[in-house]
């Protein structure tokens, strides 16, 4: 799948040169991190993180896999999601998560449920079609506040 979007300021203007640090679990729901003690398999072909930069239009695009859900506590299963930390001089650093549309587990996610309806909508990507090769594209725009 592909994730594409733009980094914008609060007025809708593009933020070029924003550093986007992203990380996620693999398709089995396991992070490539020493503190993830899951018994799910690691994928030697999947790094699980990247640092990219928004272009002159604020745009970004990357290819990844759909992360797997994973248990996070007593009766709590995290839905598939990606983590983003976005930073640009002159703006307040944003750390957030991107969720996928139409995921049943979104309704029960303890972190997502803490957010207002408008915040939840901003955190859920939208379907943006498929590539010529049949790969799903999701759209996720990120808004930074000026410092």
What are these regions (language model features)?
Residues 1-147:
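Beta-strand-dominated extracellular/periplasmic modules and repeats
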């Amino acid at each position: 799948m592909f994730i594409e979007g733009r980094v914008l300021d609060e007025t809708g203007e593009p933020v070029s040169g924003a550093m986007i640090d992203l990380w996620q679990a693999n398709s089995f729901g396991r992070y490539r991190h020493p503190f993830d003690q899951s018994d799910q398999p690691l994928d030697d072909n999947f790094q699980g993180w990247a640092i990219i930069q928004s272009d002159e239009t604020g745009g970004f695009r990357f290819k990844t896999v759909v992360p797997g859900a994973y248990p996070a506590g007593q009766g709590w299963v995290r839905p598939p999601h990606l983590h983003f930390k976005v930073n640009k001089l002159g703006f307040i650093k944003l750390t957030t998560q991107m969720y996928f549309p139409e995921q049943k587990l979104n309704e029960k996610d303890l972190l997502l449920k803490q957010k207002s309806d408008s915040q939840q909508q901003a955190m859920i990507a939208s379907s943006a079609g498929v590539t010529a090769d049949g790969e799903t594209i999701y759209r996720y725009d990120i808004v930074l506040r000026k410092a």
